[in-house]
Amino acid sequence: MAPSAWAICWLLGGLLLHGGSSGPSPGPSVPRLRLSYRDLLSANRSAIFLGPQGSLNLQAMYLDEYRDRLFLGGLDALYSLRLDQAWPDPREVLWPPQPGQREECVRKGRDPLTECANFVRVLQPHNRTHLLACGTGAFQPTCALITVGHRGEHVLHLEPGSVESGRGRCPHEPSRPFASTFIDGELYTGLTADFLGREAMIFRSGGPRPALRSDSDQSLLHDPRFVMAARIPENSDQDNDKVYFFFSETVPSPDGGSNHVTVSRVGRVCVNDAGGQRVLVNKWSTFLKARLVCSVPGPGGAETHFDQLEDVFLLWPKAGKSLEVYALFSTVSAVFQGFAVCVYHMADIWEVFNGPFAHRDGPQHQWGPYGGKVPFPRPGVCPSKMTAQPGRPFGSTKDYPDEVLQFARAHPLMFWPVRPRHGRPVLVKTHLAQQLHQIVVDRVEAEDGTYDVIFLGTDSGSVLKVIALQAGGSAEPEEVVLEELQVFKVPTPITEMEISVKRQMLYVGSRLGVAQLRLHQCETYGTACAECCLARDPYCAWDGASCTHYRPSLGKRRFRRQDIRHGNPALQCLGQSQEEEAVGLVAATMVYGTEHNSTFLECLPKSPQAAVRWLLQRPGDEGPDQVKTDERVLHTERGLLFRRLSRFDAGTYTCTTLEHGFSQTVVRLALVVIVASQLDNLFPPEPKPEEPPARGGLASTPPKAWYKDILQLIGFANLPRVDEYCERVWCRGTTECSGCFRSRSRGKQARGKSWAGLELGKKMKSRVHAEHNRTPREVEAT
């Protein structure tokens, strides 16, 4: 078996052992708090903007915190929303395709509804008063400048004289992945620039310099799927700034076979790249790329790789620290589907680009480090003070020797891969019912340290709020899912996510619309100190009276209680109710069950992460015993199910939860078992009168009462008795029963006995709220 197959089997085996265990606790991978779409709206935690037509068909989103605006690109339109209000006064600019473009798109065989329109896909800041917007233009990409005004103004209109071709800036298709960033008046874009989507390139355009693009050599880009582009400075010398592209590509198998594999890359080009003078004219002369590795170590050195790059978030640090790259990956294996989050230090990426180049003698050979002499200036290095040395005036890439450019063209790949921090993912998800598409991160200062809160957007319209606790070294981090927030009413893939640390808001976009979501709402965790502490949310702390937002400036106050790493309320919440006190505070609720039938005792803990335990106190016993489950008694997620109730099951059941050593009582239920002999006494059998023969034809069969199906499903053993009782109740107060019951004289007799049935019902504490003249549902329908 191949090493990768061994790794997959090892990972699946571990997941099956973990997920299939009969332990009482689902673990911290289950969200502690689940909030539905309605819950978020009622708590005033989210605000939704769906556009004037009820659906935006969102394609692009740009968060401008300088202007306090959120700009959206949709179907034939752009929108501007103010951040200081919940979308009360949006601005809209209609931007349909130019005359004739839609018709030409249809003639070329494209779909008139989903493709032959202007899908606005690029929104980039152009200057202090304008945005650069580009759309697909019905498969004829178009760009224009959008006036947005100065800070404090809420204006939005398109400059008609600025409309120009967007080829090389925006994809032709509305669904094809791409990435772009705007730097010093120029747009850098990674995309497929042709109508058929086959010509992949990295393109620079829009400024005073000539346009620059990738070489057409297939060794540079193999069917890339661009995810992100960003300018990342390396030092104080701006001439050394580079634009980094994060993407996946499909390459030939490294073993020289005919198969292809998917790998993730980080590539870069210099901002001041001007191409070559004789070689690589108007082409990138500083392009390099390296592999991004995100894998789970397995036995024997085998690794399970997550090779498909889904999204990237740059966590900019405070002064003196290295930038961190959070990357979301997925598997491309047909065996199982999984997702992982890996974190890379930017210093490690720089080290790889300063390392050896990858080289092989031919397509059938293995890759190895280049062992020859590397020309000067080193290929991939930007023209700067380092290269403009006395006697070697390399002030521009056009001054680079031809051998440098030829080497750069032949060796764009680095030999060393970029490995994540601690050598493994900080988060692995392989048991999700949904897929993960988007990631943003917020670094939060808590009482016991600093934590990175990860927000993950799914394909079902929900957001997962997660923290990963690293124990140190290469140990596997502990994953804690804090919340699962259903942002949109209808399940829809989340395609855009932006975070505003200043406003403590998350902006979530989908094809339907955009939502403004608070990063935290601490009071939803509960009203007790223990519940606030067990939540382990870095945003929240107990202030002595309630669970509120933690502010580091106030963190030194004595009564601020917070424990993210351990979540131990016993240490943080002294004087709170213990288990024995909690049992006495929860009143017991009476529950009745019938012998030999099924009965369900419901227990819904506040936290799905807690371990649930059932205790039974039988009459006469000194203390409670733990309920033992078997084929007859089942422990489900929502409570305790008795498939066949016994008279010995009577007693007081206490449902308790245990989480991080803290136990609390959820519910107490006093189960009273009604034995079968008692039912026989309550409903004595009566002789059945002879039925008159049918008048010709087939004998008519009375319709079956609706309640009989339910009683048969739960295995009720005294169906004739209940049937008899129900007929008496329905016939009470009427002069004639329905045709599906007995004769009129029989109904009069039943009316006389119906009061006895009511008295019996009172003794059984049954709750009958039906009206006096209620009839079976089947009779009402006739």
UniProtKB/Swiss-Prot annotation:
Family annotation (InterPro entries): Ig-like_dom, Ig-like_dom_sf, Ig-like_fold, Immunoglobulin_dom, PSI, Semap_dom, Semap_dom_sf, Semaphorin
Keyword Transport recorded: no
Family: Belongs to the semaphorin family.
Keyword hit for Disulfide bond: yes
Superkingdom field: Eukaryota
Organism: Homo sapiens (Human)
Protein name per its UniProtKB record: Semaphorin-3G
Glycosylation sites: N44, N127
Domain Sema as annotated: residue spans: 32-519
GO molecular function terms listed in the Swiss-Prot or TrEMBL record: chemorepellent activity; neuropilin binding; semaphorin receptor binding; signaling receptor binding
Residue span(s) of domain Ig-like C2-type: 569-671
SUPFAM superfamilies (alphabetical): Immunoglobulin, Plexin repeat, Sema domain
Disulfide bonds: C105-C116, C134-C143, C270-C382, C294-C342, C522-C540, C603-C655
General function of this protein: Has chemorepulsive activities for sympathetic axons. Ligand of NRP2.
Gene3D superfamilies (UniProt xref): Immunoglobulins, ligand-binding face of the semaphorins, domain 2, YVTN repeat-like/Quinoprotein amine dehydrogenase
Keywords of the record: Disulfide bond, Glycoprotein, Immunoglobulin domain, Secreted, Signal
GO cellular component assignments: extracellular exosome; plasma membrane
Organism placement in taxonomy: Eukaryota, Metazoa, Chordata, Craniata, Vertebrata
